[in-house]
Amino acid sequence: VCMILSDQLIVDNGDFVVEHLDASTENRHSVDSFASGNNAQGLELYLKNFALNDELLNESRTYLVKDSLSKALACYFSLRTCLVPIALTKSLFTTVSAVELANFAVNENYRKKQRAIKKIGAYVFLEFILPIVKHIANLVGARWLCVYALPDEKLIRYYESLGFARL
């Protein structure tokens, strides 16, 4: 279920609420309690130190996924538009318009408190990220959703399990 309220896209499916980082002072302060996993310190650093500035400069949109009951920050993701270069031949390239899933991380503090919730990342991807990206693609004409995964085979396999393919 989606509703556009002023310039903020609000999504609420009863379990989680998705809001822009800049939608409220409460949202801006909720990131202080975010903790990423062992290999994702850069995602935590981005959320706490750079995401709001990127939001204000219209470089990307950062969405906070909060528990509907407790309002605890469960995870976040950032989206932006991009062009993906495609080699047609060795010397001829073209580009394809896309939406980039620039950042995506689960709050380990939330995961520890909510052990009964399994595969929250996949759930958020399917329930929130894909519908928002499809809406964006219809508005701006993007053909792909892309993610630039670090050279971590486990992470790449995870994205492949969600339907991504290596280029």
Whereabouts are the PLM-identified features?
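Non-catalytic substrate-recognition and accessory regions of acyl/acetyltransferase enzymes
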Residues: 1-117, 123, 127, 131-146, ...
